[in-house]
């Protein structure tokens, strides 16, 4: 199973990107992470025809890190898709997400280079309010 992490700040276009990407990857599952109890992005992705799983009420970079690793292993053991597309909450530190998932990488699970989606029109606002988070996502992505 190849893991694709698509990070980006709130409203950057992660969900739209994942919707288009998942349609190009036949054998893929989407794992949504939302800090809130209601997962809006999960509803937006229903038209992809893909299985969509979610981890809610916390961030996979911190409070949900154990659930995250367990969920990824469970997906590999039960569904075993070719690709697992992960959309972390927009407030997640990509460095911590990578750190949390790296220990479970082995011959059956490969973490591909992370992607960060950036909304050019929001950069000034984000850099003013969330500079550390924004820079973490950019510095830890490959695309």
Region annotations inferred by a language model:
Residues 2-126:
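Nucleotide-state-sensitive switch-loop elements of NTP-binding domains
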Residues 114, 131-143:
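Contiguous mid-protein beta-loop-alpha structural module that forms a pocket-lining wall or clamp
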């Amino acid at each position: 199973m190849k893991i694709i992490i698509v990070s980006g700040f709130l409203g950057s276009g992660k969900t739209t990107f994942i919707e288009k990407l998942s349609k190009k990857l036949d054998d893929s599952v989407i794992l949504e992470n939302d800090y809130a109890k209601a997962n809006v992005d999960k509803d937006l992705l229903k038209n992809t025809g893909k299985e969509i799983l979610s981890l809610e009420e916390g961030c996979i970079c911190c409070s949900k890190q154990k659930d995250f690793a367990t969920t990824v292993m469970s997906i590999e053991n039960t569904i075993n898709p070719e690709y697992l597309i992960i959309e972390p909450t927009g407030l997640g530190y990509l460095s911590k997400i990578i750190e949390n998932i790296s220990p479970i990488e082995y011959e059956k699970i490969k973490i591909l280079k992370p992607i960060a989606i950036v909304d050019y029109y929001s950069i000034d606002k984000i850099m003013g309010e969330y500079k550390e988070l924004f820079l973490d996502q950019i510095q830890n992505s490959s695309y």
